[in-house]
Amino acid sequence: MSDYKETLNLPETGFPMRGNLANREPVMLKHWYDEDLYGEIRKAKKGKKSFILHDGPPYANGDIHIGHALNKILKDIIIKSKTLSGFDAPYIPGWDCHGLPIELMVEKKKGKPGQKISAAEFREECRKYAAVQVEGQKESFKRLGIMGEWDKPYRTMDFGTEANIIRSLGKIADQGHLLKGFKPVHWCTDCGSALAEAEVEYQDKFSPSIDVRFVAADEAATLAKFSTPEGHQGEGELSVVIWTTTPWTLPANRAVALHADLEYVLVQVEAHGEQKAERLILASELAKSVMDRAGIEHFHNLGFAKGSELELLQFNHPFYGFTVPAILGEHVTVDSGTGIVHTAPGHGQEDFVVGKKYDLEIANPVGSNGVYLPDTELFAGQHVFKANDSVIDVLKEKGALLHHHAIEHSYPHCWRHKTPIIFRATPQWFISMDQAGLRAKALEEVKSVEWMPEWGQSRIEGMIEGRPEWCISRQRTWGVPIALFVHKETSELHPDSLELIEKVAKLVEEKGIQAWWDLDIAELMGEDDATKYEKVLDTLDVWFDSGVTHFSVVDSREEYNFPQEERTHSADLYLEGSDQHRGWFQSSLISSVAMKGKAPYRQVLTHGFVVDGNGRKMSKSVGNVVAPKDVTNKLGADILRLWVASTDYTNEVAVSDEILKRSADAYRRIRNTARFFLANLNGFNPETDIVPAEEMVALDRWAVGRAFAAQEEIIKSYDEYNLHEVTQRLMHFCSIEMGSFYLDVIKDRQYTAKKSGHAQRSCQTALYYIVEALVRWMAPIMSFTADEIWNEMPGKRDKFVFTGEWYEGLFDLAEGEDLNNEFWSKIQAVRASVNKLLEAARGEKVIGGSLQAEITLYADDALAAKINKLDNELRFVLLTSSATVKPLSEKSDSAKATELDGLFVDVAASEAAKCERCWHHVADVGTIEGHEEVCGRCVSNVEGEGEERKFA
């Protein structure tokens, strides 16, 4: 027997069954960088059609988390698939490097600027800190197998990028979109700075809910509006009632707002017990609910009036000695409250807008630290949130408080400090959404973009329609300066602003943003102007920094310098989490439309947030955090990459140890399929051993055809960014089409056919074609494993799979072929039915293995005609030692029905001897002299010309 073992074509490969990825991947990674793989890809793709995926910059602070890994892996898969599709797709990773979180970290170590450390030194410390953070994150991203311009990423703090951010501001100002205004903005009292929309998050908070009386200044004039008849005008004090959850804003109250079209009622509160008689004005729809919460049971209506009739009536401020007007506003509703809104133009966006219309004072008695200014009557020196109780006490004392209780509601918080914020009117710089038609143009451009998923379009449209002006100024130290000069008396911009901005940008390009603070104005504009103008000392919102990277990076980097006729937009694709509709997607769109009149991207693709296996947010306190480093150290990056590609990432993306274990199981199945291919290509040289397609065994041609069909679907799914469809198709191909059928059937031929004979070489030709395609399908997702396979494959090839393109050597079966796809589908159905009966026979101890079986198939005429096309090779497809086809009319009593109509099968144990080489039970075993242990087929395969196979 041992002599015959040497004659078998046994599989052999250096590609191990176990991936051992955690140890093997770092070695491969070093090889990639030693050989400059990214540079090799760029050389190979030079001159090809371009594809630009522009990286949204993560913030340079802390370790990367699983959301970062999801985002960067998705981008890398898409870039690699585009490269294989023949695109030149450079990838320049970026980092957001200015802003408050870095300032806070440096403050902890060095103190606040202007105290223990100068502002210039503080900026330098921030720059150093950010650089260290970038390097840490960079190594983590590289470990995930992400290819890119890691030696020259973009950082918003690079001098050239800072200069281009300043130039962007100049372009926006030049297009007429810049606005200086004293407006209420989101203000964090802990940051001591304005916040952008994207820096605000909403959390539940308990607040005092109060109903407050504003007594009518002219009772007769007010009563007249309600047309109450003589003698029925009621009794007691006459007031409008406002409702608010921010008592601290009442010192800044300058009006009460009603809706022009709402009906208001004059309610007589009757004297009853301790309740005094009084008259209250409320929205008719809300009067009952106000009375209920105030505990007033005895009341009746005196008269009604439209909101429009009450305009400009005067009411006394509840604790200051001045009157405020009744005004009309569209923002007033009857969803809650009293239908009358307390209006403080310095503390609310809607209040500000309506206040401008009525020329109200925009009072702001609150300092940047959230404390009332020294001249604030009654409340000077108190922090606004602590002052709520003081305000309520004063209202009680003045008899102005109708009712108060605590409510829990959604309230804006600072995204960094997680503390409640306020609206506060301050002089700020804005990008105006309407003064030069920016909102309308942005909405028009939204329609030209392909949003994936589609709901992204309506989401961003709603946000742009409703958003206020973009407040781009910050009162911070570590940021790109708003490099403008304003007139000391009029606050007007210098008439040569664009020219001056370019001069400043050139200085910043050379020395960084510190050049602005070191700048002597006279050197830039001459002594005369220098006496009249001063520098703006605010810095830019970090969302402006990242928002203008379509210009500061994409339009400016040499790597993206493609022929203009190819480019319809700065970038082809932006890909970030779905929270970026209110963040980076929006800041990029607004700035690009403001600068260039068009969207910066052709497509926008969003992914959901990562949650645990139970759908809960990742949280250290819950203990459900999955760190990318832990996964790569334990399972390897390819498992993490396969997890990313296996999920429908447009929804929430779940991860847990169990989910990653499932990815590891799927990985093993794919790896083992690839290993089978490689092991059975042992001894195959594609330059000399390829069998022409028309001469290949029919089943081998079918297998290549299945790979051809799979490749078409896989490339289409890659092109449409449906990565989970890629992995599903890949798994189906490996497990079902190959593993459950083709690879199972060909083992006999591959192992036992004549070494280097036609039957074996046909099979190896198919395996070679398929693995050439398979390794490329895998490469964008399981990059390390694909590279490992590539290095074990036979034949001459490029150094790396990543520099090539999809394999073009596959071919499909023609539908006109006799043994076409439909034929092989039917044969697989027959095989599945036979296998069930073989399993049953094995369970009943009729046979041991399937090769011990002799089967007879009783088939109807149509099915018999199909099966008979395989002639005497049917047994190889069914993995039995003998298979005979007979008409259904001759069916024996022992034949059993199958799941297929028109097919019965009789399973019997073979009485023939077993061939010690191929294990088939065949009548001619022992009949050939000198080869008593083997069958005639094996003798031919060992010493003769080898068996002939046509079909299987």
From Swiss-Prot:
The gene is ileS. Zn(2+) binds at residues 915, 918, 935, 938. L-isoleucyl-5'-AMP binds at residue 576. A motif ('KMSKS' region) lies at residues 617-621. Its EC number is 6.1.1.5. InterPro entries: aa-tRNA-synth_I_CS, aa-tRNA-synth_Ia, Anticodon_Ile_BEm, Ile-tRNA-ligase, Ile-tRNA-ligase_type1, Ile-tRNA_ligase, M/V/L/I-tRNA-synth_anticd-bd, Rossmann-like_a/b/a_fold. This is Isoleucine--tRNA ligase. Its cofactor is Zn(2+). It comes from Aliivibrio salmonicida (strain LFI1238).
